[in-house]
Amino acid sequence: MMSDHGGPGRAATNAWMSTTDKRRLPEIIGAGPGRTGTTWLHRVLEGHVDLPYGVKETQFFNTFYDKGIDWYAHHFRHATGKRKIVEICPYFFDPMTPERIRAHIPNCRIVTTLRDPVDHTFSAYKLVVHFAWARGSFDEVLKSRANFASDNRYATRLRTWFDLFGRENVLVTMYDELRAQPQSYLDRVTDFIGIERIELSARPEIGDDVHSFARAPRSPWLARRARRLMYWLQGRQAYGVSNLLERAGVWDFCYGGGEPFPPLTTEQEQRIREHYLPEVEALEELLGIDLSVWKKPQARRASAG
């Protein structure tokens, strides 16, 4: 039984509430959004918190919700209760996810990282082409995918997270800080999670590299089939097979090898920046911060990963 908002209805909620205490579910969810250093943060937190077993992102609350809460809890079966349980997964923009998390983990705390809307839009474009969700030029994809117009509405989405979890339980960080001062950024996150600070100088293997996509796939047909296989394996929690294919370079071969992505033009950047200006100003008011840097032309479009 479903509520009007897509979350579990009262009867369904009561049915699993009696066993929820026997499950181990995340206390903290890093909700992204995507393309904001989530992979980097997951790597840094490994060994300091209990993360999902075998996979970085379960995508339970947006993609695999119909599999049920026990499917999700199975990812944390290794947790003993001695460490914080955390998932890093880009749920931020999904309209159904906040209420679903609230229904199952009412005391969950949320970490978000916000990025210049122009950079984020360009990075998202490269991602959807890389995984063959779309093909074409930046302008063609922007016109064909409705979610591009609604994504980056940070203030609108943040209000929902604040309303459901309480403003004090939602940490809002900035991607610019991660890139410029990764230690300072990480300190804020670990303090919020409630674990000892992690010194990046002691983890040279981590570095400050954030995963980016430089090229389109050599074959959209091949990339689509690789993506379907990846999701098929994930739905069955066959992460060992998926990870083996990754280590063997299969995913990189399927998703890469095509033409490099051209940088945004000045006209494209200006158009996107003007489109999101009201939302940026709303975010400034909501958070009480100055985001004037997001209102100016930037010289980093070609490297936006």
Q: Model-derived features: where do they sit?
A:
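Anion-recognition interface
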Residues: 2-305
